[in-house]
């Protein structure tokens, strides 16, 4: 990812080390979350608004996916939490209150300082991270300012997330590849 900013103090990105966050869970909690599946909805984060073709396409065909809560890295075999406060909204099979309580616990746990790396953008900076073992967080106030923030992102196609139980992620609604192609072609 490369970024251009006009607001000097909005140049930080936070990357969560999802493998470390998983490893630091207690053994009983790891055993519990290993088999759980999360429901993810692709939508603009709070405070942001989709515009134009993106908004039209995502309203026509919402992107809803079931991912394992714990993902196994295809190359290293390490487990990591596959959680994102921006997308993950429920845990399949749990009552709403149970789901919300567990998500809050996992979100709070995963953003502890020992699991985060902060990267400060400088002119010409380019950052790479492995989304199979990390999670990206934009600055909290990025959408509450009048300053421009332009990001250039390359996402490499890869494999579907596989959980500790061996099951892959499943698209429940929408097609993210078709959406990306439609946006690219227009």
What are these regions (language model features)?
Residues 1-126, 131-186:
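Non-heme Fe(II) oxygenase catalytic core, chiefly the N-lobe of the double-stranded beta-helix
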């Amino acid at each position: 990812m490369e970024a251009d900013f006009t607001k000097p103090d909005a140049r930080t990105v936070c990357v969560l080390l999802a493998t470390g966050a998983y490893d630091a869970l207690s053994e009983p909690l790891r055993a519990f979350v290993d088999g759980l599946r999360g429901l993810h909805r692709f939508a603009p984060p709070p405070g942001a608004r989709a515009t134009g073709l993106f908004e039209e396409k995502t309203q026509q065909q919402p992107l809803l996916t079931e991912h394992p809560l714990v993902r196994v890295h295809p190359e290293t075999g390490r487990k990591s939490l596959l959680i994102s406060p921006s997308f993950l909204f429920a845990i399949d099979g749990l009552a709403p209150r149970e789901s919300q309580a567990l998500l809050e616990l996992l979100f709070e746990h995963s953003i502890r300082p020992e699991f985060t790396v902060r990267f400060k953008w400088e002119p010409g900076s380019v950052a790479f991270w492995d989304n199979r073992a990390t999670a990206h967080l934009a600055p909290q106030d990025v959408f509450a300012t009048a300053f421009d923030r332009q990001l250039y992102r390359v996402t490499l196609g890869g494999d579907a997330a596989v959980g500790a139980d061996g099951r892959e992620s499943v698209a429940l609604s929408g097609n993210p590849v078709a959406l990306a192609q439609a946006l690219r072609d227009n």
